[in-house]
């Protein structure tokens, strides 16, 4: 039970931090995420290497760090659960980036993911096509609050921009 609880907490908390403190703000204030993750190459490592921009790796690290920062808190609850959660998070990253035209998530798995509010590759592809949609790295229930956060941050950016010009 502790294994499952710590794995689930790591995924929930990590996805929350990744969505609201990294991913959405990066779409508003940053540039590397959009250039790298929403480009045809889709790789922080490839971008950093090919364009001689090692700082791009820092932004790739932020996505990972959102999950890793919970390790000290959850490790005492269950080390195995933490390791399971980190493995599941990484496997989900790999799975949700299946953008081959021939790939289709099996119908039974789509139903299960919808029931558990888990992002599928098809849903994640919506985000790559339109950066205003389908937020939440792992969990779909973060999408609507993330869209509100996105709008709020854009308004804040606009206000800051006007203040700097004044």
Language-model features, listed with the residues they occupy:
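Hydrophobic transmembrane helical bundles of multi-pass organellar membrane proteins
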Residues: 1-166
